[in-house]
Structures are given as structure tokens and as C-alpha cells.
């Protein structure tokens, strides 16, 4: 029989992997497919969580909170992509500086409205049954996070590789001018992708705010972890993001249980090794 501590550590790692995938999947869409350096993605996660918290305070309906957080950040993403990023498209330095500045504004706005103390969204009872699994009792909401991440991964894969919309997106990444010449409005298409990226970050913020807590500063932590996931898996690869999230989540869980002082720094070890051996990531491709 497996040691209960090891079972708990593995399950916690899978839960963290699920949350990281929800965040990183949005980042890999913006960073990998659109070549947009969106370093405000962590701030999207943070603000989405607090918007969901506000909706939950009013409605007490968790699904509305998740939808409100996602849609609210999708609107913020629309503003950012069409008003701010459109004018500096392709200039990576300008995109980096702009998104860093935008994330700082969001963090300060959150601090002004909700304060600096940690807040969390109440877990609904119907999403949090006590589940007996492999000899231990485990919170059902953590398993829900894992299930949700699997559903999102499958949905993204179907959209990108089994639909005409996905074919247009991938063609637009490879040759924007050719797709535009075919009469496809590539600008609107990429705006839609960026809004989806923001929606995923906002929804992940509500999930993370229910699983853990929300506080200014968590945006930077999860931005860094999402970047690690995307770099390990390969930019633009949903499957790579899933592998990167799984690896990072398990490392965070095991290092937190056995080497707590080194927990965060150890997550960078596989990224360094993979960058040295395969700079494009496990499932990524070279970007010219």
C-alpha cells in the first residue's frame, strides 16, 4: 500500500498542475501563437480572481463568479489588444514594457479597491465533497480543478486542430499576409485569441482564489510559473503546456513537502536543462 503522505503529495501536485495549466494555456495562446509578450498575464489572473470574488459576494453562485471573472478579464484583454498593443505589434521590447506597466496598474488598482490582506472565495459544498481515494480522504474541489484543466486542454486541442477557426489561426501565425490576402480578417481573429487567453487567465484566478487565496503578489508568482510551464512545453503548444504544468506541479508539491526552502527555485531546474538541450521546448518548434 502506498504511503499516505506520498499519495497526498502526488494528488496535491496534480492539483497544482491543473491550476498552472489553466493559467499557462492562456499564456501559450498569446505568447506562442500570436507572438505577443503579455507579461500582464499574471495580473489578469489576479484581477479575474478579485472580480470573481466580488460577483460571489453579491450572488453566492460560484459558477457566476467564474464566468464573471473570465468575461471581465476578456473585456480588459480586448481593450489592451485593440487600443494598446495594436500600435506596437511586433516590437517585443515595447510590448514587454507596456504589459509590465499595465500589470503594475492592475496590481495597484486591486490593492486600492480590495486592500492587501488575503481573500478567498468560498468553496461551494456541491463542488467539494470529501472523496476517499487511494487510502486517504481528499477535498473534491481539488479533483475538480484537475478535471476542469483536462476539459480545457481537450477543448483547446479540438479548437486549434479540428476546426476551421483553428486552421485559420495557425495559418495566420505562419503567414499573416497570405491569410489576409485570402480575405480573412486576421486582426479580428487574433483579437479573439487574445480575449480567449485573457478569459482563461481570469477564470483561473477564480479557481485559484477558491483553492488557495488572492493577494497582491500572487500575480508575479503565477506569471513566473506560467512562463516556466510554457518554456518547458514549447511556445504555442497546448500539449506542451500540459506536460510542463504536470512536471512543474509535481516538483512544487514534492519539493514543498521535502525541501520547503528550495521549493520555488527547484521548479527552474527542468527549465534550465530543457532550454540547454532543446531551446524550443519539449513540443515547441523554432520561431524564426
Regions found by a protein language model. Give the residues of each.
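Hydrophobic core segments of alpha-helical transmembrane domains in multi-pass membrane transport
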Residues: 49-53, 70-76, 102-110, 148-157, ...
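Membrane-embedded helix boundary and interhelical linker motif in transport proteins
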Residues: 11, 33-79
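Helix-loop-helix "hairpin" substructures at the membrane interface of multi-pass membrane proteins
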Residues: 16, 22, 137-214, 238-243
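Membrane-interfacial amphipathic/re-entrant helices at transmembrane-helix boundaries
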Residues: 1-22, 51, 59-64, 91-96, ...
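Transmembrane helix-bundle core of multi-pass membrane transporters
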Residues: 87-162, 189-192, 254, 258-261, ...
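Transmembrane alpha-helical segments in multi-pass inner-membrane proteins
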Residues: 20, 24, 61-71, 191-201, ...
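Cytosolic-side transmembrane-helix boundaries in multi-pass membrane proteins
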Residues: 5, 113, 174-181, 185-188, ...
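Alpha-helical transmembrane segments within multi-pass membrane transporters and channels
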Residues: 60-103, 109, 243-248, 278-279
Amino acid at each position: 500500500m502506498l504511503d499516505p503522505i506520498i499519495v497526498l503529495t502526488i494528488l496535491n501536485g496534480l492539483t497544482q498542475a491543473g491550476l498552472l495549466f489553466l493559467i499557462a494555456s492562456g499564456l501559450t495562446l498569446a505568447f506562442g501563437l500570436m507572438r505577443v509578450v503579455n507579461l500582464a498575464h499574471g495580473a489578469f489572473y489576479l484581477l479575474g480572481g478579485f472580480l470573481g470574488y466580488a460577483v460571489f459576494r453579491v450572488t453566492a453562485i460560484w459558477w457566476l463568479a467564474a464566468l464573471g471573472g473570465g468575461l471581465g478579464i476578456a473585456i480588459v484583454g480586448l481593450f489592451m489588444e485593440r487600443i494598446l498593443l495594436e500600435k506596437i505589434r511586433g516590437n517585443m521590447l515595447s510590448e514587454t514594457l507596456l504589459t509590465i506597466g499595465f500589470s503594475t496598474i492592475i496590481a495597484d488598482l486591486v490593492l486600492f479597491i480590495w486592500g492587501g490582506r488575503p481573500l478567498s472565495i468560498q468553496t461551494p459544498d456541491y463542488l467539494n465533497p470529501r472523496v476517499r481515494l487511494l487510502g486517504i480522504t481528499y477535498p473534491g474541489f481539488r479533483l475538480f480543478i484537475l478535471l476542469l484543466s483536462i476539459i480545457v486542454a481537450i477543448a483547446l486541442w479540438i479548437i486549434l486542430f479540428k476546426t476551421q477557426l483553428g486552421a485559420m489561426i495557425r495559418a495566420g501565425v505562419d503567414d499573416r499576409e497570405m491569410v489576409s490576402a485570402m480575405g480573412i480578417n486576421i486582426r479580428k481573429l487574433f483579437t479573439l485569441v487574445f480575449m480567449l487567453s485573457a478569459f482563461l487567465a481570469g477564470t483561473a484566478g477564480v479557481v485559484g482564489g477558491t483553492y488557495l487565496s488572492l493577494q497582491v503578489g500572487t500575480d508575479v508568482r503565477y506569471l513566473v510559473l506560467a512562463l516556466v510551464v510554457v518554456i518547458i512545453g514549447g511556445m504555442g503548444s497546448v500539449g506542451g503546456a500540459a506536460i510542463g504544468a504536470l512536471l512543474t506541479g509535481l516538483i512544487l508539491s514534492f519539493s514543498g513537502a521535502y525541501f520547503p526552502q528550495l521549493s520555488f527555485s527547484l521548479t527552474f531546474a527542468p527549465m534550465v536543462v530543457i532550454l540547454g538541450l532543446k531551446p524550443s521546448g519539449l513540443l515547441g518548434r523554432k520561431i524564426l
